[in-house]
Amino acid sequence: MRALNVSRYFYLIALFLLGHSALAQDLKQEKMEQLGFLVGEWIGTTKVFENGVVTKQGSAYENISYDLDQNILVIELNTEFLQLRTIVYYNVEDQKYYYHRFSKDGAARYPAEFKDGQLIVWKDDKTRFFFGKSADGGFREYGEQLIDGEWIITFEDTFKNTQ
């Protein structure tokens, strides 16, 4: 009789863990779907700013797609000045996105959040990147630095979807 109670106890624990895992997967899928507006083959322009003035401008190409059953978002950026490969995913335990950036100079991981319809990546307390929809159906990616209490734009990429 005691063995029956123990096995029932383990059965209930297993059932609870399976249910919890399914809920976590649903939350992760929902969070990743919020980034769906970024998916596409994008062509546009990139601008680099110094002190509010454009110092470099060129063409930009970005291919963004889901991978691993929509558990990650893969961003391939190529501009005249920069080539990046980035993986974005949502961590259920931390309840935040992570932005893994890879370039020829190395790799980094930054926390991110989805707020007001855009992905906001925090490199540090004074540097952030935004990924958001534009009014014309494209998307805009830009970076800012906090200088003397004011957010100053450092780069801007604007894209139109070719798909």
Predicted regions and their residues:
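Edge beta-strand at a domain terminus
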Residues: 145-163
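N-terminal helix-cap/turn-to-beta initiation motif at the start of protein domains
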Residues: 27-43
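Central antiparallel beta-sheet cores of small beta-barrel/beta-sandwich binding domains
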Residues: 27-29, 45-130
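A short, compositionally biased
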Residues: 40-42, 94-95, 137
